[in-house]
Amino acid sequence: MIKAVIFDMDGTLVDTERLGIKAWKAGAAELGLAIDEALIHQFIGRTLPDVMDILDKHYGSHETTEAIYRRHKEIRDEMVKTELELKAGAAECLDELLAAGYHVGLATSSRLVTAERNLKMVGLFDKFETVTCGEDVVHGKPDPEMYLLACERAGFAPEECAVVEDSRNGCVSGITAGCHVFAVPDLSLI
């Protein structure tokens, strides 16, 4: 029986992935570089160290990776202030689950400071009983560590937890952890 529902954040609850794609492209362009959208899609659901490794391999230079990341972050942080949107039905879903007595948790590859900022902006942060972030794990999604820790923090076995995810990496993470996984893909990214 499912007793807890653990949500991914980016692309599942808030539309940050669309902003991230725009910011990666703009940051690279400002530095005179190109970044392919297929490469950016590899970042979805991954921790920052994993993203940096992907970029290091792609560009062959950690200095280039650092420069693109810094500019992307500046652009994204500005965009979030005015363009961040809640995914349709997210707030209502959380409210219904809480009212029905389910434990509601968050498992995001984002850092806690980012998750807290973004979710407070859309009025969702206080709805989560437990929060697991990218800096809490050594191995990011698709490794199961994120969801295993989220289940542990929730106080339930993985088979008692449902995971709500939008990315392939996140779904693989939840499935490998032994959770029930519900995929809600962001159709604008397909």
Residue ranges with predicted function:
Residues 30-33, 60-63, 123-127, 155-156:
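Short helix-capping segments at alpha-helix termini
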Residues 1-3, 95-98, 111-190:
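Asp-based, Mg2+/Mn2+-dependent phosphohydrolase catalytic module
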